[in-house]
């Protein structure tokens, strides 16, 4: 019965993305937007080929600039995986201009994902709750929704313009970044290992259809990944159990799926748009609220001005930590996703369980 359900899901994924197309070349050319997704794709393709990664180093998925060599990768791609247009905002026009012949898979639309609604304005911005921000932080469970077919049609036909100059790219990226902050669905879907398992099913279906001669290898790799993801989920649940009630604040509201899965107590975010630096007035307001909420930790991100956190925690009892939803400092490859998620759990457990340093 379980095998039958799994096969049915694979068929649904294949139908959702047009059934794929078989590639004649010995090795398919697969391009992936960000490291966590690249890691899952690399795990499925291990022993057959190596997918190319676009956002490297500590680059932001919201404002990354493609190099000419990466533009060529898109032009030559058979398959492109990305999360979606309100996440990798830099890719919107490039995919239309350069990857029109590729099978482009927008992963947030994969059937079977648990999706969470974006928390409007971020927890700190919920003025209607006054100082009851901790209550706002625990409302995310109300927004769980199963993915349905209408999501696959929400963004069709919105971007018909051709690839043009850098100025127009900047405007498009800025507008899409605003959409990221205010869109209906939180796009950080990979930060729940149960969603990662669904993504693996989609990935193996797509690459198997594109490269049927290696489909059995992809399936074997995917089965191994599913076991590893289940073990990762269990170990993270155990690691976080003793600190799940301690309040903390993050740099931007990227971790809702992680919070929902493991029941940890995030009570605020410094910003809803990580590309825009908070004003001095806002930083003062947040500093006051940190004291009011008695937050145990404030977490920076390596991509976005970690020094801000030093300013915010000065004179409070909060510890400083670093969380990275992309694993930007980790080497790309099949192990990256597992190290990313383990690092998130370790960083939370260490900071929330520690005493004030300095």
Where are these regions (language model features)?
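Extracytoplasmic metal-acquisition and chelation regions
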Residues: 17-358
């Amino acid at each position: 019965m379980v095998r039958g359900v799994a096969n049915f899901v694979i068929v649904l994924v294949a139908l959702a993305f047009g059934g794929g197309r078989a590639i004649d070349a010995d090795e398919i050319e697969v391009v992936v937007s960000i490291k966590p997704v690249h890691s899952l794709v690399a795990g499925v393709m291990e022993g057959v080929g190596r997918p190319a990664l676009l956002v490297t180093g500590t680059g932001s998925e919201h404002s990354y600039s493609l190099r000419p060599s990466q533009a060529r990768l898109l032009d030559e791609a058979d398959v492109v995986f990305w999360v979606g247009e309100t996440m990798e905002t830099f890719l919107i026009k490039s995919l239309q201009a350069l990857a029109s012949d590729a099978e482009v898979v927008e992963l947030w639309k994969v059937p079977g994902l648990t999706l969470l609604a974006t928390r409007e304005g971020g927890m700190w911005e919920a003025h209607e709750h006054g100082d009851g921000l901790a209550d706002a932080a625990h409302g995310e469970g109300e927004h769980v929704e199963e993915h349905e077919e209408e999501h696959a049609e929400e963004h069709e036909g919105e971007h018909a313009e051709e690839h043009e100059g850098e100025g127009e790219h900047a405007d498009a990226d800025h507008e899409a970044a605003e959409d990221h902050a205010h869109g209906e669905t939180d796009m950080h879907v990979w930060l729940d290992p149960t969603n990662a398992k669904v993504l693996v099913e989609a990935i193996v279906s797509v690459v198997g259809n594109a490269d049927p001669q290696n489909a059995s290898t992809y399936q074997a790799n995917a089965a191994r990944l599913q076991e590893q993801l289940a073990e990762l989920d269990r170990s993270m649940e155990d690691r976080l159990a003793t600190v799940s009630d301690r309040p903390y604040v993050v740099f931007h509201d990227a971790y809702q799926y992680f919070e929902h899965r493991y029941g940890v107590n995030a009570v605020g975010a410094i910003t809803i748009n990580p590309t825009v630096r908070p004003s001095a007035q806002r930083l003062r307001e947040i500093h006051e609220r940190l004291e009011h909420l008695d937050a145990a930790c404030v977490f920076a991100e390596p991509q976005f001005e970690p020094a801000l956190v030093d300013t915010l925690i000065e004179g409070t009892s909060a510890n400083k930590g670093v969380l990275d939803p992309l694993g930007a400092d980790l080497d790309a490859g099949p192990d990256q996703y597992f190290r990313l998620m383990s690092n998130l759990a370790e960083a939370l457990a260490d900071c929330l369980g520690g005493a004030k340093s300095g």
